[in-house]
Curated annotation (Swiss-Prot):
SUPFAM superfamilies: NAD(P)-binding Rossmann-fold domains (SSF51735). This is ADP-L-glycero-D-manno-heptose-6-epimerase. The gene is hldD. InterPro entries: Epimerase_deHydtase, Heptose_epim, NAD(P)-bd_dom_sf. NADP(+) binds at residues 10-11, 31-32, 38, 53, 75-79, 92, 143, 175, 183. One of its GO terms (molecular function) is ADP-glyceromanno-heptose 6-epimerase activity.
Length: 313
């Protein structure tokens, strides 16, 4: 069996879909369906069972046996970069992850987890090294702290001549694609611009969006990376992005091209994002490629075209 936490979320449900397409359906999905809209991400997927996140964590902490587990994809987290309740964030993203990690280490279960490019903050060098990290929000800090916790475990194991089972962290950059309808304000810019045009409006971008550049990565490619590392058993913390920085304006142009209508408009930059907003991200893929992962990443034009064809069908 494979366990996918956050399996009703955007990335988690797409991983389940990718596993199904690979002929795997012995899957336990763990999530919190308090936001009931997320059920839509699961209705077309084949899984063995579903478990609430709190019940799952209780059983993990009790050391319960789930039977043979091939791997755990840990995608479950509070991913709202605008959430400033640090106690809540650290409990959900840090403590929960540590419990699950040690459960896997004790049983030699491969543990593949979601980190984030939010760990980098304002740097212009996006290399998986501590010196380039400095989160701008508590979400990024929670991910940064867990990455550092994993690094300490590796260092301790090395000093004692021990070999840990697989631990693989993925620093997701700006992920977009199908199954993000439930995310509200945290959904991708492509999602919001598409909705605006469908509502008969012009697509709206924040002032300065022609200069804001992010590494926008299509969720289907993210899943390919996850499955490659599952198959090859490589440990480490790796950037998961395209290696390209493209502007929000390029995303808007791709959405307009799909619809063949719409004129890009600008709106004031919101005060609550000032000082906590990454204006530039671009994954350095050196470490990913050195590991042997040869997944090719779609450009914004390619990814948005595929996404909106699915979204608007």
């Amino acid at each position: 069996m494979i366990i996918v936490t956050g399996g009703a979320g955007m990335i988690g449900s797409n991983i389940v879909k990718a596993l199904n397409e690979a002929g795997i359906n012995d899957i336990l999905v763990v999530d919190n369906l308090k936001n009931g809209k997320k059920f839509k991400n699961l209705v077309d997927l084949d899984i063995t069972d579903y478990m609430d996140r709190d019940d799952f964590l209780t059983q993990i902490m009790a050391g319960d046996d789930f039977g043979p587990i091939e791997a755990i994809f840990h995608e479950g987290a509070c991913s709202a970069t605008t959430e400033w309740d640090g106690k809540y964030m650290m409990l959900n993203n840090y403590e929960y992850s540590k419990e699950l990690l040690h459960y896997c280490l004790d049983r030699e279960i491969p543990f593949l987890y979601a980190s984030s490019a939010a760990t980098y903050g304002e740097t212009e060098t996006f290399v998986e090294e501590r010196e380039y990290e400095g989160a701008l929000n508590v979400y990024g800090y929670s991910k940064q702290q867990f990455d550092n916790y994993v690094r300490r475990l590796w260092k301790d194991a090395e000093e004692h001549g021990e070999q840990l089972s697989q631990i693989t962290g993925f620093r997701y950059f700006n992920v977009y694609g199908p199954r993000e309808d439930h995310k509200g304000s945290m959904a991708s810019v492509a999602f919001h611009l598409n909705n605006q045009i469908n509502a008969g409006e012009n697509p709206k971008l924040f002032e300065g969006s022609g200069h804001f550049k992010r590494d926008f990565v299509y969720v289907g490619d993210v899943c390919k990376v996850n499955l490659w590392f599952l198959e090859n058993g490589v440990s480490g913390i790796f950037n998961c992005g395209t290696g390209r920085a493209e502007s929000f304006e390029e995303v808007a142009k791709a959405v307009v091209k799909h619809h063949n209508k719409g004129e890009i408009q600008t709106i004031p930059f919101p005060d609550h994002l000032k000082g906590a907003y990454q204006e530039f991200t671009q994954a350095d893929l050196t470490k990913l490629r050195a590991a042997g992962c040869d997944v090719e990443f779609k450009t914004v034009a390619e990814g948005v075209a595929e996404y909106l064809t699915i979204q608007n069908s």
